[in-house]
Amino acid sequence: MARYPKRQKVKRYRRSFYTREMRLKKGIGIAVLVVAVLAAAWVAAPHVLDWATHTWYTVVRDRDLSASSAVSESASSGAQSTAASEPAASSVPEKEPEPEVKGTDIVTGLWAEVDVTTLTDEAAIRSAARQLKAQGMTYAILTLKDTAGQVYYASQTAVGAANAAPTQVELTSVASIFKEEGLVPVAALTAFRDPAGARADHALAIRYRGQEYLWLDNKASAGGNPWLNPYAAETVQYIGDLIAEVHAAGFDQVLLENVRFPSSTSAKQDYGTTNGVDRAGQLTADIAAWQARFGDTVTLWYGYSLAEVTGSSSQLGAPAAQLGVKNLLVKVPSSSTLDAAARGELTLSLTEAGVEHLVIRDDAASYFE
């Protein structure tokens, strides 16, 4: 039997039939797969690390990272916001704060008087204040003790309480509301022309020489009235106590009027012990005593007539500017007026005499500033 030679088997591999195009596609697929794996690892890595860290500390180390993580994140975000805001803040220059205006500060502005008897409640007080502000006013004068000696608030002094006016105002409300509306409230107090106070306490009054009777500035039948005695320490104390009361209620500025003697001089007048001090000297001492008592806590104004300012009078014994007055309110009589030039001359002369602040009231010219 004839034998045929054994045929050699041929092994065939699939790669033997790969074309170039197939190899290219395979390479691209592998590259895409690698990129996908790397991307997935990149995304998952933080979470895996957080999980691993949390597991390590909570399971292995028995610790809780939630609180510390929150604090860390808060600190980090705070630092980032601070760093972000610093360039903006540094690029804008800081505006210097304006100095605060105190109640005792004297500012330029218009003045007006307020009828205290109309300030019956909070609504009336606020309405009056807003009307003045709408008219451009800065200062509001409220007479709290008049020339009759009546006091328009609940004074705690014995003499003031004995001479309470029929209308009483709530000082704290008046002062606070006027300030809220942008006004400077000024308490006006009549000083030595005070018949009610003299009758309530004879120790404060001028008497007839050698008698216990109160001296009157005219015949009783003609309506004569007693006056407070500028030489009496009790009188100076009483006026000072009234200043203290209105200041405690919120009035930082006070206008004192009738800081003077009666116009008449008579040998029948008994002022007690004068130690040889004349009228001008005693008024200067009284003004200095109030200034020493209140210092910078209260701004004290003094009101005088034009005649008392420009010349000497029996009431003062010297021009008002020579009494140590720093803040002066001058009243021009209604029968005359001052033009701008005359006001300038008056201001200059009083400034040279030592007056620091001057307000002129000229009703005929509708000028009060």
What label would you give each PLM region?
Residues V186-R193, V254-N258, V277-Q315, G354-A364:
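Aromatic-lined carbohydrate-recognition surfaces of secreted/lumenal glycan-active proteins
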Residues A123-V151, E245-E257, A320-V330:
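Catalytic domains of carbohydrate-active enzymes, especially glycoside hydrolases
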Residues K102-E113, T117, F192-A244:
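Active-site-adjacent "subsite" loops/lids of carbohydrate-active enzymes
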Residues P93, D146-T190, V259, S264-V298:
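Aromatic-lined substrate-binding rim segments of carbohydrate-active enzymes
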Residues M1-G27:
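N-terminal Lys/Arg-rich, disordered targeting/topogenic segments
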Residues A45-T53, A320-E369:
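Substrate-binding cleft of secreted/luminal carbohydrate-active enzymes
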Residues D50-V107:
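N-terminal, intrinsically disordered, polar/charged segments of Gram-positive cell-envelope systems
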Residues I28-P46:
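Hydrophobic membrane-insertion alpha-helices, especially the h-region
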